[in-house]
Amino acid sequence: VNQYAMPPRLESRLRTIKFAHYLQKAGYEVTIFASSIMHNMDIDLIEDDSLYIERQYGDLNFVHIKTAKYKGNGLKRVIGLIQFPRRFLKIAEKFPAPDCIIQTATVPFGNIIYRYARKVKVKYIVEVLDLWPETFVDLGILNKKNPIVPLLYKFEKWLYTKADQVVFSMEGGRDYIIDKKWDTDHGGPIDLKKVFYINNGVDLADFNHFKEQFKLQDASLEDESVKKVIYLGSIRLANNLKKLIDAAALLKEHKDVVFFLYGDGDDRKDLQK
């Protein structure tokens, strides 16, 4: 269950669909429940009032659930975050009962899916790709003094506590729980034995294909006389590209150092100025 999972032709965050692909190759039957709204795109896969649609993309089985269309991080996105788990509960019984639910955490909106997992008595695994609300606090989007912040941390702690297993996509997940004193050694409810780290990894079949088929022709990249600093990824607030650009400005007199930034995102136009 990942609200933001997309069909392969649109997806840039490949973790969910790659996991599904290789789980199926290993003999598991996988269904991905996702929103009909494609994040950061003006696309709704459901053009009528249907509550959901089923689609198959190669070996990937998707159920797209209708949610509010939005741009940016305003009220409509919050409405969509509330709608998705509630509508998932409405349609879940139309499908065969699962043996396991893997949910990409969206604290606190996704916590309701735990109730369904317990109702059908299946293993419930929480996958953590972003720290909610820690990321928003670190970026200054939410102030620690905001009364909603302690509540969000409480929901996050509850979700990790209730999960049968917690899988972080980044290193330091266990340390994060320890720092919060949520682990059993600090009197908290979370057993660190159920906390794991699995990074996004690389699909070598894709990598080997792309490196042959999509070669970037740039003489500067081939220049062995200069040191290259290369960034490849989204250009958004969370990745703090301004710091890298400021570093490039400090080194602009060093002609033997060249910075390459490849990507796109909300901050690109402002940073180009």
Predicted regions and their residues:
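An aromatic- and histidine-rich active-site surface loop
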Residues: 8, 78-89, 98-122, 126-135
